[in-house]
């Protein structure tokens, strides 16, 4: 009867039967060997990718990133104001970001402003979606931690 060879463990099993293979493959040493094998394989793949990227960059096939360090002796172009960073001369610093963004105010628009998408007093057509507001998505306002509810008749220790 042919023997079964385990590539991960570099060993032959006593014989090739499903029960022997199952027992071997569920063993601690086999699992460690499989984990080590794939960990080494991933490291080799990552190093190969790094080497290929470095070679392509050195050959000029990959352009430098726009905000990378400038070559020696050249002037650096400052990033746009939306990227943050220190204020430039003559500019006011940006206000600090404190707390979550404010929730939009609901109600009629200020006088002279038209509502987004529809005329005054008009509702969107049936099945139509409301238009998206520009800007970042709004966050839920912070809430108190949820209190555990007790069953009727049980004393509440927090009161």
From Swiss-Prot:
Gene3D superfamilies tied to this protein: Classic Zinc Finger
Location of the protein in the cell: Nucleus
Keywords assigned by UniProt, alphabetized: Metal-binding, Nucleus, Ribonucleoprotein, RNA-binding, Zinc, Zinc-finger
Positions of Matrin-type zinc fingers: 4-36
GO annotation terms (biological process): mRNA 5'-splice site recognition; spliceosomal snRNP assembly
GO MF, one example: zinc ion binding
PROSITE patterns noted in UniProt: ZF_MATRIN
InterPro entries: Matrin/U1-C_Znf_C2H2 (IPR000690), Matrin/U1-like-C_Znf_C2H2 (IPR003604), U1-CZ_Znf_C2H2 (IPR013085), U1_snRNP-C (IPR017340), Znf_C2H2_sf (IPR036236)
Family stated for the protein in its record: Belongs to the U1 small nuclear ribonucleoprotein C family.
General function of this protein: Component of the spliceosomal U1 snRNP, which is essential for recognition of the pre-mRNA 5' splice-site and the subsequent assembly of the spliceosome. snrpc/U1-C is directly involved in initial 5' splice-site recognition for both constitutive and regulated alternative splicing. The interaction with the 5' splice-site seems to precede base-pairing between the pre-mRNA and the U1 snRNA. Stimulates commitment or early (E) complex formation by stabilizing the base pairing of the 5' end of the U1 snRNA and the 5' splice-site region.
PANTHER family per the UniProt record, alphabetical: U1 SMALL NUCLEAR RIBONUCLEOPROTEIN C
Protein name as it appears in the record: U1 small nuclear ribonucleoprotein C
